[in-house]
Amino acid sequence: MTRHFGILIPSTNTTVEIECRLLPAAYQAHVGRLMTSTPGRTFSPSRDEDIEYQALLLGTAKVELVILAQTSASLFADDYDEVVTRRMSAGAGVPAVTSAQAVGRAVRALGARRIAVVSPYSEAVNERAARYFQSKHGLETVVLQGFGATDSYAIGQLGPENARDAFARIDRPEIEVFVVPGGNFPTMTSIAAWEQEFGKPVVTTNQASFWAMLRAFNTGERIPTFGRLLAEVPAG
């Protein structure tokens, strides 16, 4: 049986669709694109009207879940996750989740509390991320490491070696999980190798979104290729 989910992405994102194709054929992603609400502002949330319309369209495709794959948007308002998931659910008629929610919940599901955030973002956005994970998910950020990307295009140009080298620089015993936010940051095919090298789980935006999808569908299937989170699919 094929299961269908919707995923909303910024119009500039060039990675999410590629990583969705790595999923088993039984899980089909249907994508809607969103325009930024504030042109020229770095990592601003997408337009409400785009979110509503694209969610409505995805609902006509009979998706069972809608995911907003725009982690940075959740960092700009305390109630953003709650407001946007209500908007998405109202449009599509199905449950909704943000990728930021998925990341936080995934870390908790792995039984961890202390994280290192290795992101493509600037220092200011990283600080927002640390506050978000603390206030929304009770996670302590032990280390923040950013690459200073100023837009989504720059994130898409990063490679797995950027994250791996950052892990090597900042790794320490108190870090329980490496968190790599950013849906346009290509990570999926490197997660298992990172975990083997550093001996701890890695949670990334797209991987956590797929975990949330598997949990929502409750099929019991595991996907062992992309790190511990998808190999175990822990409840959370």
Q: What is the predicted role of each segment?
A:
Residues 146-154, 200-222:
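Short, flexible loop segments at boundaries between secondary-structure elements
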Residues 48-62, 162-175:
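Short, well-structured alpha-helical segments in soluble
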Residues 55-101, 105:
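Glycine/small-residue-rich loop that forms an oxyanion/phosphate-binding "nest" at active or ligand-binding sites
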Residues 84, 91-150, 230-235:
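Conserved beta-alpha
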Residues 1-53, 121-159:
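N-terminal glycine-rich anion-binding loop in soluble enzyme alpha/beta folds
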Residues 164-194, 209-210:
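Hydrophobic alpha-helical
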Residues 64-69, 116-118, 175-182:
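Periplasmic-binding protein-like
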Residues 85-107, 194-213:
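Short, acidic/small-residue loops that bind anionic groups at enzyme active sites
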